[in-house]
Amino acid sequence: SRGLGDVYKRQILCTLFFGKIANKFAFALDLYYLCSRKCGRIWLLATTEKNAKTALRGFSKPVRLYQITFVFVGIAVFLPSIMYHYYSGEKPMNYLFTSESVSEGHPDKVADQISDALLDEFLAYDPNSKVACETLVTTGQVVLAGEVKSNAYVDLMEVARRVIHRIGYNKSSYKFDADSCGIFSAIHEQSADINRGVERAEAMSQGAGDQGMMFGYACNETDNYMPLSLDLSHLLLTELAVIRREASAMTYLRKGKVTSYLRPDSKSQVTIEYNERNEPVRVHTIVLSTQHDEFVTPADDSKEAQEAADREMLQTIYNDVKQVLLPRVIAQLPERVRTLFDDQLILLVNPTGKFVIGGPHGDTGLTGRKIIVDTYGGKGGHGGGAFSGKDPSKVDPVSYTHLTLPTILRV
């Protein structure tokens, strides 16, 4: 611990650079430090620069009352701050980290999937196709835009409708369905200036259509080397989609038929608590928002009856998420992750209270707006480029296939 010699040196330095008043406050700090470190005998060094040496020998000169008062005033002023910084340094605090995911029916993901399906269709018939396809989806409308150079003919509208139907938007009540939505295409030929940079006689000398920054990241929190918060967010929505298609749980009786009340649009968010060694210690919070049918009919047209029906729907969904979805997800996890779920878990389901209006009717969707969901959930870095609807001459998607994936597999 700090000795009295160090105290004396600090007093002299404070006097030289900051004056006598600063000297007395600095001494008050040193006095507290000596006491807190339990260095044995507690010395009351109420001194000025004139009698510092004699005070160290045991107060051979009389101590003035104002000097003692000044010392204790200094202690009272600085003690709380010193205690906070001193002890917080020895006791690091846990911290929280959150990642989110979105379902296949989220508007932005609908747009991503249409763009990817168009790309796949072009490459299937002409592997040398150059494609940059963007999609916008909104109420009853799909807009396709971008640049393509290919020898293949693709029925753009048929591909888009097929994707929308597979996702589950196949009812007119959704205000966006595969059979009736309008589809407008503004896709045109790729720029010749870009094409001259990507066309090569040899496949191994493929040029890049643009510059870009890409980041790879891997961790040992999960078996697939992805951050735990993101992995759990994905798994929640993947299992929710399975339940929706099975229609054996999270259902209601509609016109004498058991029907799933789940609709395609949903989001999840998982918060993990970490200790000072960056190790996950527990699942802190799960937020899950899922679009649903209006499966409880109000008793009458009054506002009170509608609110009562909304509360009943919310309670049903909450119970099903807690008793059906979570157990199915946890059962798929390794033992070391299962132990992170405890009774203190905060579960929030449809926090706004109702989620009937959703999908592209509720929010406009665009290709490339979920780049953090598509990568590492906020951990690691991101260069800003999206993946969907781009052929291999675009550096954003191809880098994760040829560079990042082999790196992860070697970990």
Language-model segments: which ranges?
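N-terminal, positively charged regions that mediate nucleic acid binding
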Residues: 93-130
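Conserved small/polar residues in nucleotide/adenosyl-binding loops
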Residues: 2-11, 401-407
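Glycine-rich, N-terminal phosphate-binding loop and its surrounding beta-alpha-beta segment
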Residues: 131-134, 140-198
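Short hydrophobic alpha-helical segments enriched in small aliphatic residues
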Residues: 15, 26-28, 40, 52, ...
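C-terminal catalytic subdomain
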Residues: 369-371, 376-403
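Short, Lys/Arg-enriched N-terminal segments with co-localized hydrophobic residues
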Residues: 69-92
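Glycine-rich, mobile lid/loop segments that gate access to catalytic sites or pores
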Residues: 98, 169, 174-356
